A protein has these predicted regions:
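A structural signal for short, well-ordered beta-strand segments and their strand-loop junctions
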Residues: 68-69, 91-93, 130-133
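Active-site beta-strand-loop-beta-strand hairpin of nuclease catalytic cores
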Residues: 75, 79-100
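Short glycine/proline-enriched coil/turn segments at helix->beta-strand junctions
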Residues: 65, 86-88, 124-129
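Non-catalytic C-terminal interaction segments of nucleic acid-processing enzymes
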Residues: 2-30, 40, 136-224
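Catalytic cores of nucleic-acid endonucleases
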Residues: 96-153
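Residue-level "edge-of-site" marker
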Residues: 72-73, 135
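Catalytic micro-motifs at enzyme active sites that drive phosphoryl/nucleotidyl and oxygen chemistry
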Residues: 68-72, 78-80, 118-119, 174-175
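Acidic-basic catalytic patches of nuclease active cores, encompassing PD-(D/E)XK
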Residues: 15-72
Length: 224
């Protein structure tokens, strides 16, 4: 564990991101960096994930949100980034497509199930829920979560629940929870430039379609 390097990297990133920001924004962003450094000392975070959280947090701070990172929601769930502005609560969960060794033979299914699990479990704690990802990764979000809840069926929700429960079963998610779970936005987080692009979920779905259409066809998934 190289705490000095971790802190140096985050401070360098924070300084680069905030070079033209107000002093208030700078102070808040560096405070987030310090929180992440303390979590790194406890071996709770890694630099690649922390860099994405920092850049995302800075974008929300600039929009007037009061931001926290690695915030505990209940006894089990800790969200990556949460922002509060007035009565609005926004949660952003980072998803980079990491596949553990045990899922090496079914990486696409594992990634899709993890994305579904994050939307189902975290969105109920937020007024708006977003997934944060990198420009080099395309999120394979089941269209179920992009459709309005009124257009979903219990059969669809049951299918999603079966897939999620294979990988994640705590906290338990009901079919009713799934019907209400919504992905509102995708945050494309470019650490290199320290910029964040916010895309509404339906627009992202259309953008991703050309990339994912063949992939879904060969996997035998339902047409979108």
């Amino acid at each position: 564990m190289d705490i000095r390097r971790f802190k140096g990297d985050l401070y360098e990133l924070a300084g680069k991101a905030c070079c033209d920001d107000s002093e208030e924004v700078r102070l808040n962003v560096f405070a987030i960096a310090d929180i992440l450094v303390n979590l790194y000392r406890k071996n709770l975070v890694k630099i690649n994930h922390s860099a994405l959280e920092l850049v995302c947090a800075r974008a929300l701070i600039k929009q007037g949100y009061e931001v926290k990172v690695e915030h505990r929601l209940d006894k089990i769930l800790v969200c990556d980034v949460i922002g509060s502005r007035g009565d609005e609560r926004l949660i952003v969960e980072i998803e980079t497509g990491f596949i553990p060794p045990e899922a090496a033979l079914e990486p696409s299914g594992y990634a899709r199930n993890r994305i579904s699990s994050k939307i189902a479990r975290y969105s109920r704690y937020a007024d708006k829920f977003a997934l944060g990802t990198t420009p080099s990764y395309t999120l394979d979000v089941p269209r179920f979560f992009v459709k309005p809840p009124r257009d979903r069926t219990r059969e669809e929700a049951t299918q999603i629940k079966t897939l999620i429960d294979v990988v994640y079963n705590e906290p338990e998610i009901s079919v009713d929870d799934l019907i209400q779970a919504v992905l509102h936005m995708v945050f494309v987080i470019d650490v290199d430039s320290t910029n964040v692009q916010e895309i509404d979920a339906r627009t992202y779905d259309r953008m991703a379609l050309s990339v994912l259409d063949w992939h879904r066809t060969v996997q035998g998934l339902n047409p979108r």
